[in-house]
Amino acid sequence: MLGAFVNTVTVSNIETVVGAASSDTVTLATQFTGGTLDLGAGSDKLTLGLFDNTVTVAGIETVIGVGSADVVTLAAATTGVILDLGGGIDQLTFAAAGATVTVANIETVTGSAVADLVTLNAQSTGSTYDLADGNDRLILGAFTNTVTVTNVETVTGGISGDTVTFGAAFTGGTVDLGAGSDSLSFDATGATVTLANVETVTGLAGDDLVTFSAAVTDLTADLGAGGDKLVLGAFVNTVTLANVETIIGGNLVDTVTLSGAFTGDTIDLGGGADKLTLGTFTNTVTVSNTETIIGGGSVDTVVLASQTTRGLIDLGAGGDKLTLGTFDNTVTVANVETITGAASSDTVSFAAQATGSTVDLGDGSDRLILGGFTNTVTVSNVETITGGLSADTVTLGGVAAGIAIDLGLGADALTLGAYDNTVTVANVETITGVGSADLVTLTSQATGSTIDLGGGTDTLTLATFINTVTVANVETLTGGASSDLVTVSAQITGAMIDLGVGSDSLTLGTFDNTLTVGNVETITGGASADLVTLSAQVQRGTFDFGAGTDSLTLGAFVNTVTVSNLESLTGGASADTVTFAGQATGATIDLSDGTDRLTLANFANTVTVSNVETLTGGAVSDTVTLGGAGAGGFLDLGAGNDTLTLNAAGSTVTAANAETITGGTGDDAVTVSAASGGMNIDLGTGTDQLTLTSGITATVAGAETITGSSGIDLIVISGSTAATVSLGAGNDRVVSGLGVDTLTGGAGADQFVFTAIGQSATGSADTITDFVPGSDTLVFDNSLLTGTFSYEGSATLTATGHSQASFDDASHTLSVDTDGDGTADMEIKLTGKTAADLSLSNFSWS
C-alpha cells in the first residue's frame, strides 16, 4: 500500500498494489498474473513489464504496456483513462459500469453493461471492439484503421481510411468514418445503421437497413443476401450499389449505380433530378421519383411506382421492359423493348431508335412520340402517335378508338390490328388493315400512299389536299375539297367512292369491280369487267373502262360525261349528255328519263340505245340499234355508212345521215332530216310512217305512209307493203313498190316510176292522187317496152304488137298493155283525170 504521497515505484511479484490520494507512478518489473492494482485518487500511471500480464486496475489514469500480451481489466467506472498496451496481442475489459477511455495498441476491447466511450489514439489494425450493452461509442484515430466492432452504437472515424467490420448484429447504431476512403462490413445477422462518410459498405446474409446522414459522393455498397434497405440523406449523393432490395433517396440529386443484379427490388430516389444506372445483369426493379434511368446490356424490367414528369429512361441493350405507374406520366425512353402504361394519361417520347418495341399505355389519353430514327413499334392503347424524321413502322396491337397518328417525314407504314378501328392519320405512306371494320381519316396530304384495309367493312376519308393514293379493300372512300388521284389495286365489291370537290381521278385494278362513285371526274378501268354506279352529278367526267365487259349507271342528275371502252351505260331520271371518246363495240346504252344526248366518236361503232333523245354519230360507219321504243328522239349518225335498227316494239325517231334504217314489228314513225347519200329504209311490219324533211334518195320498204320534203325526193318503194306516199314540193321521183300504193307527187315536176308489172298490176292498181299532165311524168322501165309505145286515149286496147295505154274516164284508170296483145297488163288510177288530160308526152320509157 502506497502512502498519500506522489510515489514512483517499481514493483515485482506483488499481487495487489493500493495507492492513496496522490499521483502514483508504478512500474511492474515482473510478470503480473491475476493481480489487482488500485492507485486511488490522483493522476496515476501504471507501466506493465515486458511480460504476458493479466491485471485488474482501478484508480489509474494511464496504463502503459510494453511488448507482450497484456490482459487488462478495468475494475471500476473510469473517465479519461489512457491505455496503451504496446506490442503483443492485448485485451482490455471493462468490468465495472461504464468507461471513458483512450486506447492504443489493444487488439481486443470488451465493454461493460452501460455506456462506454472508447477513443483510439493510435492506428488500430485488426482490433476487435465489443462494448456490450449500453449506448456505446467508438472514436477511431486519424490513422488507417482496421477494426471489428460489436455492440457499439456510435462509431466515429478519423481523417484516414478506416475499415470497420460489425462482428454481430448492429441495431440502431450510427457510424461516421470521417475523411478518407472508409469501408464498413456487416455481420451475417444484419445491421440497422445510420452512416456518414463511408465509401464502401458490405453486407452479408442478414437484413440490413442503412441510412445515410451525410452526403455520399463516392459510395460503393453491396449489402449481400437478405432483405436490405438503403436510405440516402437529403444531399447530392453518388452511390454504387449491389444487393440492396430497397433504395430510398433524399430531396436533392441522387446518382445511383447498380453494380449487381436487382431482382424485385424497390428504388425511390425522392426529390431532385435523380439518376439510376442499372448493371449489366437481368434486373427487375420498381422505381419511384427517379428522373433518369440507365440500363445495362442485359434484360431490364423496370416498374415506375410514382409519377414521372420529365424522366429519361435508357435501358440499353437487351429485351427491356418498362411499366409506368397509374399517374399522368411524361417520360423520354431509349432502348426499351416493351412499355406498359396504366390507367392515366402518359406521354412517352423515344430518344433512340425503336426496333421491335411494344408499347401499351393502357387507359387514359396517352401520347407516343417516336424519335428521328427508323423505328419499328407495336402500339396499343395510345391515343396520339407522332413519328420522327425517318421511316417509322407502326403496328397497332389493340383496338384503336379515335386515336390520332402522325408519323412525320420518311416512308412510314401503319398496320392496324384485327379490331374495329377508328384512326386519324397524317404523313403515313403505307396503311394496312387486317380483318375488321376500319375507319381511317387522313388529315394530311397523301403523296404516293398505299392503303390496304383488308377484310371488313372499311372507310377511308382523304384530307383536303391534292392526294395521290393507291387503295385496296376499302368499302367507303371519301375525298376532300381538292384534286384526288386514287388507284385501286384490289378487287372492289360493293364499294362506295366519293372524292368530293376538285378534279379527281380514279383508276381501277384489273379485277371484276362493282362500285358506286360520286364526284369523280376521271375514271380509268382495268382489263376486267367493271360495274360502276354514279351516286352524284358528273359535269365533266371522263371515264375509260378499258378491256372487259364494263357497265356504267348514271345518277338521277343532269350529267355530262365522256366515256370509252364501255359496254353498258344506264342513265338516270334527268338529262344526260354522254360522249364516247373511243370505239363502241356492242355497247348497250339506256339513258332513261330526261332529255338525253349521246355522241359517238369517229370509229366504226356498234351500239344499242334506249331513251336517248339526241344521238350524234361520228365520221365512220355507225351501227345503232334502238333497244327501246323511241319517242321523239333525234339521231344524226354523221359521215360513214351508218345503220339504224329500230326497236321491234316500234319507234318514233328523227334520223339524219343514216344510210340504212331497219324497223321491226311495231309501228314506226321515222323522220329523215338529212342524208349524205342513198338510203335503204325497211320499216318492217306494223303501221309505219316515213317523213322526209329534205331532199332524200332512198329505197323504202315496210312504210305504210311516206311523206316527202320540200326538196327533191328520190324514193324507191321496195316490197309489197301498200304505201301512201306524199312527196311534197320539189321535182320528186318515186318508184312504186309491189303493194297497192297511193302516190301524191305534190308541187313540182314529179316522176312516177314503174319498173315491173307487179308494181301496179291489173286488179292491184296504184293510185296517183295529183298527177299533173304537162309537168308530171309516168316513167316505165325499158324492160317492159315492146316495140314502140302509143297512147290510145279512151279507145279500147287492141292487139297491136307494141306497148300501148288507154284511159277509162269513168274509173279514172290508165290501162297499160306492155306486150301489145290488146290486154292490159298494168292499171294506174289517176285521181280526177280524163283521157283527154293525157298525151304521149306524159309517158317516158327509160
Model-derived features: positions:
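Extracellular repeat turn/loop positions enriched in glycine and acidic/polar residues, especially those
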Residues: G3, A20-S22, A29-Q31, G40, ...
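Feature detects tandemly repeated or modular, low-complexity segments in exposed regions of proteins
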Residues: F5-N13, Q31, F51-V55, T78, ...
